[in-house]
Design a protein with these regions (language model features):
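Non-catalytic alpha-helical scaffolds and adjoining flexible linkers that form interface surfaces
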Residues: 1-228
Length: 228
């Protein structure tokens, strides 16, 4: 977020402190060395030196550099759209200012996997949501059941529609099982239509929203639907 004429405010998910808010000065200045602003695109991996200010909501960043150069994500509209979605989801869900190393490592791996993918890109955001649920504490509690249904309220697969009827339909339930068992580099083996992706996204956001109110409205979903 631009702040003043030459500064910006950035929301970062860090390895040591979880979510942190930083003020970066001179990022838009013509006198600065290099284009710092380019490093703060959604889901870019950076290494930086910061000045922590106890009890403050905003901290200051001294030096910043690219940690892992991304070769395709900034230039592929499909990947950059997915990275925007990932960033928004994490912004809404990760509120803690404390370390969460497993989640941090998963997010970093996911960014690198997306950048290197050549097949299955259109399914990556669906896979990311499914895998993310494991790090947020509500991954499906049992193995998929053939021709079964996923109980959104209970968080488990059932052989029939639960009495409360808050569940994924059979098609989305089957896809959930497929994505639970699928590695990112095999996403190209799932031939999904635009309608299937949209329906599954709706089901997953309903599942997330049932457990976490913060995810109920994700603005970047509309952009995903236009592209995928």
């Amino acid at each position: 977020i631009k702040y003043g004429d030459s500064s910006m405010v950035a929301y970062l998910f860090t390895d040591l402190f979880g979510r942190m808010n930083y003020m970066i000065q001179g990022v838009h200045s013509s006198r600065g060395r290099g284009n710092k602003a380019a490093l703060f695109q959604p889901m870019f991996l950076v290494e930086f030196e910061g000045i922590e200010q106890p009890q403050a909501r905003m901290h200051r960043m001294k030096e910043v550099r690219s940690l892992t150069p991304l070769s395709s994500l900034p230039f592929d509209v499909r990947k950059s759209t997915i990275s925007l979605f990932m960033a928004e989801v994490l912004y809404r869900l990760v509120r803690e200012s404390e370390a969460n190393e497993p989640l941090f490592d998963f997010v970093c791996r996911s960014v690198v996997q997306l950048d290197r993918m050549t097949e299955g890109v259109s399914n990556f955001h669906l896979w990311f949501l499914v895998q993310l649920s494991a790090y947020l504490g509500f991954y499906p509690g049992n193995e998929p059941i053939p021709n079964g249904y996923f109980d959104i309220r209970g968080g488990v697969f059932t052989p029939s529609v639960p009495a409360h009827r808050i569940c994924m339909d059979a098609s989305c339930s089957g896809l959930l099982g497929d994505l639970m068992d699928c590695e990112a580099d095999r996403l190209g083996s799932l031939p999904l239509s635009r309608t299937q992706r949209s329906a599954f996204m709706e089901s997953m956001l309903l599942f997330f929203g049932y457990h976490l109110d913060a995810i109920r409205t994700v603005r970047s979903v509309s952009i995903l639907r236009e592209i995928f």
